[in-house]
Amino acid sequence: MDLAEEGSGGLHDFRFEAGGREISGRATWVVDASGRGRFLVRREKLDRPSPIRHGSSFLWVEGLLDPEKCTNLDRKQIRLRSERSALGHFPTFLATNHYCGEGYWFWEIPLHGKTSLGLVFDSANVNFKDVSSPEKLVEWICREYPLYARDLPQRKILYHSGLTSFALDNGQTISPARWALVGEACRFTDPLYSPGGDLISTYCTLVTDAILTRDQKELETKIRFYEPLARAIYEAYVPSFAVSYCTLGDQECFSLRYVWELTVYFSFYVFPFINDLLTEPRFFPAYVRRFSRLGQLNRDLQHFLLAYYRWKKEPVQRPASAPSSTSCRWAACRRPRAPSTRSASLPTRRARCSTGSSSASRRWRASSSPT
């Protein structure tokens, strides 16, 4: 592959072998959709380290694994549960079931004749070596969720794979020289909320519009906005995964972050996309400016949630003396009130959570505080 020089307006030359013969040609555009092979990223040396240090291990087992059978409730108790009525009495195994813990989440998804199970984790909380094989992953699942031991170990394993670190970044997405990256050949954050589909659809929208732009000057003008927008869309996601992944282990903290992230998702991603505004010249200059501020705002909030999570893990301090049994009972049920001046003054303790730095081995120390 010989890429044309930027600004030359020339064509790209390509050559490849197929069926024992060499084929060559010229192209106006080159779009790398090679997935994790990342042909152009490696060729042009565009790779950049991601601050997200997460891994995954996943497998398929034969048959449908029914989570309702992994319970101590009898069939009548299962049938009469109030939440089943709210869900229309649909079998639980028909849904995607997620289980969350400190720095990880685990999925169970029914497929045709088989069940997909997988673990996504912060490397500061789970060691990939502990789940690197199908046997080790099954052992981990049964240890963390013991009722699965009644069924899962007897299932035939059909497929297994894993990634020690799956997040991807690069230095450039699209060029006026008429080449671009899409899909995992470009960037990837984390499977939580499945944002990969959002990045793919957004980047493909920008690349498609660029390909349809015939005038070189107009193309260069668009790319001056498209490139920072593509990076801002990626970087705004990063703090949600790199800073506070351990808050998945607390229902209250996760509920708070979920409401915030759902609001951001629809306001910044969904509504502009479904209204065809991403490539609207009157819209995207202001959109890029707003998006560039979202990343820092999200980072600050994720640090606050992390500090709150660490504070909640502190043991409850009982008063040295209590004037009455009523006040004793009241005090024992309450945690120490957090200072109301600044979030940075919240009491902290060591937590097994990555700070989002380039080193996955870094931990929050007792002296650290949110920024």
Question: Model-derived features: where do they sit?
Answer:
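Predominantly flavin-linked oxidoreductase catalytic cores and closely associated redox partners
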Residues: D2-L147, C204
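C-terminal helical "tail/cap" subdomain of flavin- and related membrane-associated enzymes
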Residues: A210-T371
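Generic preference for well-ordered secondary structure
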Residues: K45, T92, L163-F166, F188, ...
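A broad "ordered helical/assembly scaffold" signature
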Residues: M1, S8-D13, I23, L59-E62, ...
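Generic alpha-helix signal with a bias toward terminal, lower-confidence helices
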Residues: G37, W60, K69-L73, G118-V120, ...
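FAD/FMN-dependent oxidoreductases across multiple families
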Residues: T96, E102-F106, H112, D122-Y245
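A residue-identity detector for tryptophan
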Residues: W29, W60, W105-W107, W140, ...
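Short, surface-exposed, charge-dense and proline/glycine-enriched linear segments
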Residues: S24-R26, V30, R36, R81-G88, ...
